[in-house]
């Protein structure tokens, strides 16, 4: 619902949105958390997506403590929830800024009042540079740092900034890459650096180096480590090269770090950043605050195996300390076979690119009924989930199943509202999303 994307807390929500009870009078967003609804009590329209607010808060506290203990900063990636309220909550918890993936996402955050952004992506050519300039012309107090991996993009941005006098300063981050965008090697990065320095003005400046190690991952764990090590090494080694060209006093950023290999970023880049008093290391992890029952569950198990999650000199199990905060709730529509249930949830409602949803708990008649340890989703259609059941299962039509998900980034984008739950699963908040 695109009309929600510029909404305030006073926007009226109705049954056009997943979860909202059919026939209920429209409600302001901030009233939804006062109705006493529960996803399994029969009132809410299913499927819907929910956020365990306690788990989310715990994940935020844990990640902020981790970053602080390593002398780093974090600009959480807003592409995961695209919720301005949750982005503001992360800033209030100590985030240095916010990361976005494109110009539209930047517009969402700027309109919400945020001013320090990392645009962690290349944006295209001259037309895209003009679109970015058109946006930032409305926000003269913005601080935006953007990835660049070609002289063509540097030239396009330079031209756009030369043509207008009403733009805030633009910070350029030379991106090194492996597997996706980013300069391949020092020679390419030096050409980009020279193009930036030749065009510098007070409003158009080099502000650091960037990388994204997650794109370097492959199916082979050892090859993944080799590729990430190489990417971090070239990123780290380039910092003193910048200092030779620009001097020691200019503040610089070194930014990397998703939600799976951020421990390697800390381990490989911290020393170089610590040796530079005017430099700060900024992670961009976003999905970590939501965690999941799939790709990030596996990712944090890998982090633990590397012995990488250390806070204040102590090793903590990331796999147990972080808690999955997202659930999708769906009703059983059919029991056509003894070992099969069909549920009202499909590809339009839940992610499937990094694993299928996981049945967790069964509810019946508005109350907890049983854990679903042996049930498994094995296929999704547009609107249906195929759930394999154990022999003798008494899952019944009308039961509600609580599912864990895999990959928050491609699950949340299907939903206009994320329902915040308290520990007894009552809805106590509602968060608008702005996925366009």
Residue ranges, per PLM feature:
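A charged N-terminal "starter" segment
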Residues: 1-134, 431-436
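Conserved, mostly hydrophobic/aromatic
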Residues: 56, 79, 109, 174, ...
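Flexible, glycine/charged-enriched surface loops at secondary-structure junctions
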Residues: 72-73, 244-253, 397, 412-415
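Active-site-proximal beta-alpha core segment in soluble small-molecule metabolic enzymes
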Residues: 75-221
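Active-site loop/helix belt of alpha/beta enzymes
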Residues: 162, 167, 177-310
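Active-site loop ensemble at the mouth of alpha/beta enzyme cores that anchors a bound cofactor
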Residues: 262-364
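C-terminal accessory subdomain/extension
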Residues: 337-436
